[in-house]
């Protein structure tokens, strides 16, 4: 064989191997492009979380810390989101990422500080003395007198015959006067 033929065979081998590499690279890039378009069309991207799925995910992410449905004031970067948006607006109607979920977790409570406060309560604080028996006896005597002689200054309400609205009015009074009974005790 002449040197020309040898050069031609060598050039042909180089060209064949180059074409093989180019076609493999081209095929691989085409395959990746098809996979990317297929996953985008089927919605395999970031998913949204709503309802029970959102609550379960928040419980899993936040653990024992707990979580908020709306951000507490002054917590996290509030400059990019409006004040009335919560986790439902951010994760149910848009895609939701782990970082966004973690922003709604309650702050970490330091367990060591909580334990030391509990320990201080048990060791440093003096116990409160029990109420003396003399005070208890006075209270019991007052109870007996009240039971024997009911207070005659309170007017007794008598239901009017044939009028069923008094009980409704009474219930309304009870409900509307909670917290400010004026010394009267209502029982439901």
Curated annotation (Swiss-Prot):
As recorded, the propeptide runs across: 115-188
Looking at the keywords, is Secreted present? Answer: yes
Bias kind Basic and acidic residues: ranges:
140-153
Residue ranges of the region described as D: 107-114
Query: One GO molecular-function annotation for this sequence?
Result: insulin-like growth factor receptor binding
Chief localization class? secreted
Which cysteines form disulfides? 50-92, 62-105, 91-96
- Region annotation (B) ranges: 45-73
Q: Quick check: keyword Transmembrane helix in the entry?
A: no
Q: Where is this region: A?
A: 86-106
Could you name the Gene Ontology cellular component terms for this entry? Answer: extracellular space
Summary of the tissues where the protein is detected? All the isoforms are expressed in embryos, juvenile and adult liver, muscle and brain. At least one isoform is expressed in heart, kidney, testes, ovary, adipose tissue and spleen of juvenile salmon.
Region annotated C, chain positions: 74-85
Q: Which keywords describe this protein according to UniProt?
A: Disulfide bond, Growth factor, Secreted, Signal
Q: What's any GO biological process attached to this entry?
A: positive regulation of cell population proliferation
Region described as Disordered: 115-188
Q: Where in the cell is it found?
A: Secreted
State the function annotated in the UniProt record: The insulin-like growth factors, isolated from plasma, are structurally and functionally related to insulin but have a much higher growth-promoting activity. Acts as a ligand for IGF1R. Binds to the alpha subunit of IGF1R, leading to the activation of the intrinsic tyrosine kinase activity which autophosphorylates tyrosine residues in the beta subunit thus initiatiating a cascade of down-stream signaling events leading to activation of the PI3K-AKT/PKB and the Ras-MAPK pathways. Binds to integrins.
Q: Member of which family? A: Belongs to the insulin family.
Please identify the protein, giving its name as recorded: Insulin-like growth factor 1
The scientific name of the source species is: Oncorhynchus kisutch (Coho salmon)
Q: Name the gene behind this protein.
A: igf1
């Amino acid at each position: 064989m002449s040197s020309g033929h040898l050069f031609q065979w060598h050039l042909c081998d180089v060209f064949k191997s180059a074409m093989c590499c180019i076609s493999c690279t081209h095929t691989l890039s085409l395959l990746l492009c098809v996979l990317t378009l297929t996953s985008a069309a089927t919605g395999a991207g970031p998913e949204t979380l709503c309802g029970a799925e959102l609550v379960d995910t928040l419980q899993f992410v936040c653990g024992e810390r707990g979580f908020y449905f709306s951000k507490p004031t002054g917590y996290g970067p509030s400059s990019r989101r409006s004040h009335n948006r919560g986790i439902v607006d951010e994760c149910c109607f848009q895609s939701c990422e782990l970082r966004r979920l973690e922003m709604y977790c309650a702050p970490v409570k330091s367990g060591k500080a909580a334990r030391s406060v509990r320990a201080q309560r048990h060791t440093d604080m003096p116990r409160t003395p029990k109420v003396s028996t003399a005070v208890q006896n006075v209270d019991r005597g007052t109870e007996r007198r009240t039971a024997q002689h009911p207070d005659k200054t309170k007017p007794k309400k008598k239901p009017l015959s044939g009028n069923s609205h008094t009980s409704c009015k009474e219930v309304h009074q009870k409900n509307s006067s909670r917290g400010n009974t004026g010394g009267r005790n209502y029982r439901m």
